[in-house]
Regions:
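Catalytic-core signal marking the mid-to-C-terminal active-site face
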Residues: 2-8, 12-21, 31, 266, ...
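N-terminal glycine-rich anion-binding loops that anchor highly charged ligand groups
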Residues: 13-21, 34-60, 74-85, 288-291
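Conserved active-site and cofactor/substrate-binding residues in soluble primary-metabolism enzymes
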Residues: 16, 20, 24, 34-41, ...
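Active-site cofactor/substrate anionic-group-binding motifs, chiefly glycine-
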Residues: 57-111
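A generic, well-ordered mixed alpha/beta core segment in the N-terminal half of proteins
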Residues: 87-180, 186-192
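Phosphate/diphosphate-binding glycine-rich loops and adjacent basic-rich segments that engage nucleotide
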Residues: 157-234
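Secondary-shell segments that build the walls of catalytic and ion/ligand-binding clefts
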Residues: 208-276, 283
Length: 376
């Protein structure tokens, strides 16, 4: 469940239509030299992410992608290909391209196998950042399948429980399951207390971050977003400090988030043959690809239940949760995916709110690429 943003008419904010955001992303990717099919897929995933309110993984990622292409590590002409496959499994090489297209390909292949065999599992190697994991799990639930998506990460930013220096990434998990009457149950979460890009969003908005997201080298909480960004992105990792695992502290069971992050890396990174970032960076040159790994699983509930039974039972579960008496009047119990579904409908109708600080950075990218700025 993503955090709400300030009203779009608040000072320091602009509003852009989903179509303009989509066209802005697409125009920049094409201007950078990405192939039409890859650019269209990436733009579709990114604008859907912004529509869903996951503002850390949509258009705000363009500056990061620009840096990667300038370093030469991002293959703008990537052609993902299947390296090996069985009736149930497959392994894809993303050819060092942006992860969106290879991830869509991976989930589609998992879904095809899920329909035929009851379950399909596909891993991807040699990839880059792929946006929000929830998009790919929702691909499956939109077609009546259960979808699971995991990913390793490039940035070393999460300090293991009892550790001083970061070793892991945010290592996201996304799971989506279809109901009959209700929208799909969709969980999309980092295994750290927060995603590093969410810290970036708070800095763009000029807000402090919640306590417990980031700690310094002494293990003390950091709430100033600018200082948190310095710890996460600007200073040497051996100084220490970073994101906390889910749970925030040993006293609050952060070993569980630490363990989940390890599970994600084993399935998405180790199983696919992708890199482990603390080892990769020892020899990685600026132009070397990140070699991230992804994991996709699609399950057909009809392989286990009579058609419709699973969806009906999930409706009962969701309805029961929604009718749970709230601790505070006016704050009803929500189900994962509720806020994103509501945000998606609202933003489709009223537009996507963007901080002016972000809009200025996008304008600079447009000026550099000689493409029109469409967000005004």
């Amino acid at each position: 469940m993503s955090a709400r943003v300030p009203p779009s008419d608040a000072p320091g904010w602009i509003t852009a239509s989903a179509e303009n955001v989509h066209q802005q992303i697409l125009s920049l990717l094409l201007a950078w030299g990405m192939s039409g099919e890859q650019a269209r897929t990436s733009a579709a995933v990114m604008v859907d992410t912004d529509l869903s309110g996951v503002d850390s993984h949509g258009i705000s990622m363009l500056m990061d992608y620009d840096q990667s292409r300038r370093k030469g590590k991002l293959n703008l002409h990537a052609k993902p290909r299947v390296l090996r496959e069985t009736a149930v499994t497959a392994l894809i090489d993303a050819d060092a391209g942006l992860g969106h297209a290879a991830a869509v390909m991976g989930m589609r292949m998992a879904m095809e196998r899920g329909r035929r065999q009851g379950v399909g599992i596909v891993t991807v190697r040699n990839s880059h950042h792929f946006g929000a994991a929830g998009y790919y799990s929702r691909m499956a639930s939109a077609e009546g399948l259960l979808g699971l998506c995991l990913s390793s990460t490039r940035t070393i930013n999460t300090v293991p429980t009892r550790g001083r220096v970061p070793v892991l990434g945010t290592n996201p998990i996304a799971f989506s399951a279809p109901a009959r009457r209700n929208p799909p149950f969709t969980l999309d979460m980092a295994t750290s207390s927060a995603a590093s890009n969410k810290v970036k969003v708070y800095e763009l908005r000029g807000h402090d971050i919640p306590g417990g997201w980031v700690v310094d080298e002494q293990g003390e909480q950091v709430t100033n977003a600018a200082r948190a960004m310095e710890i996460l992105f600007q200073r040497p990792k051996d100084i220490g400090g970073g994101l906390t695992p889910l749970g925030a502290s040993a006293e609050m069971s952060s070993h569980k988030g630490y363990g989940l992050a390890m599970m994600v890396h084993i399935l998405a990174g180790t199983l696919s043959g992708s890199s482990f970032s603390p080892v990769r960076v020892r020899t990685q040159r600026p132009q070397d690809p990140d070699n991230l790994g992804h994991f996709f699983c699609a399950i057909d509930p009809a392989a286990f239940r009579a058609p419709g039974e699973f969806e009906d039972d999930l409706d009962t579960v969701i309805d029961t949760l929604r009718t749970t008496p709230p601790a505070r009047p006016g704050e009803p119990v929500l189900v994962h995916g509720d806020i994103e579904t509501e945000t998606r409908e609202r933003r489709k109708a009223k537009g996507i709110p963007l901080p002016e600080t972000l809009a200025r950075k996008i304008r600079a990218l447009c000026d550099d690429a000689n493409v029109p700025f469409l967000l005004a």
